[in-house]
Curated annotation (Swiss-Prot):
The lineage of its organism: Bacteria, Pseudomonadati, Pseudomonadota, Gammaproteobacteria, Enterobacterales. The keyword Magnesium does not apply. The gene is recO. The keyword DNA repair applies. It holds the Pfam family RecO_C. One of its GO terms (biological process) is double-strand break repair. Belongs to the RecO family. Involved in DNA repair and RecF pathway recombination. One of its GO terms (cellular component) is bacterial nucleoid. PANTHER family: DNA REPAIR PROTEIN RECO. NCBIfam families: reco. This is DNA repair protein RecO. It comes from Proteus mirabilis (strain HI4320).
Amino acid sequence: MEGWQRAFVIHARPYSETSLLLDFFTENEGRVRILSKGARGRRSPLKGALQPFTPLLIRWSGRGEIKTLRDAEPISLALPLTGTVLYSGLYLNELLSRVLENGTSYSTLFFEYLSCLQILAASETTPEAALRRFELALLTQLGYGLDFLHCAGSGEPVSDTMTYRYREEKGFIASLVVDHYSFTGLELKSLAKREFPTAGTLKAAKRFTRMALKPYLGGKPLKSRELFRQFAIKKCAKKSVLIEDK
């Protein structure tokens, strides 16, 4: 690969004493695993650039599964993700690192990812709707072609007030059962449009994407969720101390 590509670091781990093994999400090649030799060294010019949420231009070489980084240049400063939105960004990166196939193009998803990061960077609290839209875009890119607008049993258009139960690999079937797997027709229409005007439709979207992504993620828990839980616990504890001091 001789040309430059836009990319983001989505995962990194030490490799030997001075190098890094990186997963990049690239504009044209999707997820690519690349070895950056000497990137951990004190004098490496790449040390500050190879960070999450920094838009990059990169070049690499190699024919095997693990490529070798040749050049990397920041396009701009890192997108400023702090506080709770930082953990949302880490969640996006972990999703991509775990579910995308190596070397498969997801060019549309690359721009969905960039857009979501920009929304996160402009927010003080996590914009849940942006995360749900990204998850739905990811499912579409993975080939998850689910019809939200028709009953999988009858083929008829969904009705706003009726209840439909989700069945994996089949779709939504009209049902009188109301449980974790049930959605109203109105909620399904919101999922189809990727628009969530109410708290109820937003909660339904989160419930659905959790279920739909589970087969891709397997049984291994997401580290980003655990990190966010620890952050939230510490934040609550700090608030309690401040209240007691007043």
